[in-house]
Amino acid sequence: MKFKPNQTRTYDREGFKKRAACLCFRSEQEDEVLLVSSSRYPDQWIVPGGGMEPEEEPGGAAVREVYEEAGVKGKLGRLLGIFENQDRKHRTYVYVLTVTEILEDWEDSVNIGRKREWFKVEDAIKVLQCHKPVHAEYLEKLKLGCSPTNGNSSVPSLPDNNALFVTAAPPSGVPSSIR
């Protein structure tokens, strides 16, 4: 399990751990997504992401996590949504990122032997549904109506550019969108 000695977990007002992640695409067509091996279960694939640090903005946290876990840099695009995992008490800000640079060696490849691999979106959904269904939801949401603009124009499915709030379990008095 990955735990850094200087790591500080941050929580929102309702006690959910604040997380950020990116769906990293090879191009703006958003047809191939990068997944990384899990630190806990190296034979399983996940979307790169992790906890936000104190005073860190969600977009900055997402870019940092992708750099550490996947060894890529890119152009940060739109906020796809804020996904809630009731079981683990996580709220994850999920962004779209178009990869512009791929590092040969990166922090998690060197320290824990993490791997990365490109998947067609449909294949990634199938792989993620087995052990990380919440991560599969990110890609399913993407397919349901977010055009591949990567933040270059307004997203029709999100009025006024508000983030869609998605729950992994029935909502418990949480608003359907967060402004």
Swiss-Prot record:
<feature type="binding site">
    <location>
        <position position="132"/>
    </location>
    <ligand>
        <name>substrate</name>
    </ligand>
</feature>
<protein>
    <recommendedName>
        <fullName>Diphosphoinositol polyphosphate phosphohydrolase 2</fullName>
        <ecNumber>3.6.1.52</ecNumber>
        <ecNumber>3.6.1.61</ecNumber>
    </recommendedName>
</protein>
<dbReference type="InterPro" id="IPR047198">
    <property type="entry name" value="DDP-like_NUDIX"/>
</dbReference>
<feature type="short sequence motif" description="Nudix box">
    <location>
        <begin position="50"/>
        <end position="71"/>
    </location>
</feature>
<keyword id="KW-0479">Metal-binding</keyword>
<dbReference type="Pfam" id="PF00293">
    <property type="entry name" value="NUDIX"/>
</dbReference>
<dbReference type="GO" id="GO:0052848">
    <property type="term" value="F:inositol-3,5-bisdiphosphate-2,3,4,6-tetrakisphosphate 5-diphosphatase activity"/>
</dbReference>
<dbReference type="InterPro" id="IPR020084">
    <property type="entry name" value="NUDIX_hydrolase_CS"/>
</dbReference>
<comment type="similarity">
    <text>Belongs to the Nudix hydrolase family. DIPP subfamily.</text>
</comment>
<keyword id="KW-0694">RNA-binding</keyword>
<feature type="binding site">
    <location>
        <begin position="88"/>
        <end position="90"/>
    </location>
    <ligand>
        <name>substrate</name>
    </ligand>
</feature>
<dbReference type="InterPro" id="IPR015797">
    <property type="entry name" value="NUDIX_hydrolase-like_dom_sf"/>
</dbReference>
<dbReference type="GO" id="GO:0030515">
    <property type="term" value="F:snoRNA binding"/>
</dbReference>
<feature type="binding site">
    <location>
        <position position="49"/>
    </location>
    <ligand>
        <name>Mg(2+) 1</name>
    </ligand>
</feature>
<keyword id="KW-0464">Manganese</keyword>
<dbReference type="GO" id="GO:0005737">
    <property type="term" value="C:cytoplasm"/>
</dbReference>
<dbReference type="GO" id="GO:0046872">
    <property type="term" value="F:metal ion binding"/>
</dbReference>
<feature type="binding site">
    <location>
        <begin position="38"/>
        <end position="40"/>
    </location>
    <ligand>
        <name>substrate</name>
    </ligand>
</feature>
<keyword id="KW-0963">Cytoplasm</keyword>
<feature type="domain" description="Nudix hydrolase">
    <location>
        <begin position="17"/>
        <end position="143"/>
    </location>
</feature>
<feature type="binding site">
    <location>
        <position position="114"/>
    </location>
    <ligand>
        <name>substrate</name>
    </ligand>
</feature>
<dbReference type="GO" id="GO:0052845">
    <property type="term" value="F:inositol-5-diphosphate-1,2,3,4,6-pentakisphosphate diphosphatase activity"/>
</dbReference>
<feature type="binding site">
    <location>
        <position position="9"/>
    </location>
    <ligand>
        <name>substrate</name>
    </ligand>
</feature>
<comment type="function">
    <text>Cleaves the beta-phosphate from diphosphoinositol polyphosphates such as PP-InsP5 (diphosphoinositol pentakisphosphate), PP-InsP4 (diphosphoinositol tetrakisphosphate) and [PP]2-InsP4 (bisdiphosphoinositol tetrakisphosphate), suggesting that it may play a role in signal transduction.</text>
</comment>
<dbReference type="GO" id="GO:0008486">
    <property type="term" value="F:diphosphoinositol-polyphosphate diphosphatase activity"/>
</dbReference>
<feature type="binding site">
    <location>
        <position position="69"/>
    </location>
    <ligand>
        <name>Mg(2+) 1</name>
    </ligand>
</feature>
<feature type="binding site">
    <location>
        <position position="65"/>
    </location>
    <ligand>
        <name>Mg(2+) 2</name>
    </ligand>
</feature>
<feature type="binding site">
    <location>
        <begin position="17"/>
        <end position="19"/>
    </location>
    <ligand>
        <name>substrate</name>
    </ligand>
</feature>
<keyword id="KW-0460">Magnesium</keyword>
<feature type="binding site">
    <location>
        <position position="65"/>
    </location>
    <ligand>
        <name>Mg(2+) 3</name>
    </ligand>
</feature>
<dbReference type="InterPro" id="IPR000086">
    <property type="entry name" value="NUDIX_hydrolase_dom"/>
</dbReference>
<dbReference type="GO" id="GO:0106211">
    <property type="term" value="F:inositol-5-diphosphate-1,3,4,6-tetrakisphosphate diphosphatase activity"/>
</dbReference>
<feature type="active site" description="Proton acceptor">
    <location>
        <position position="68"/>
    </location>
</feature>
<keyword id="KW-0378">Hydrolase</keyword>
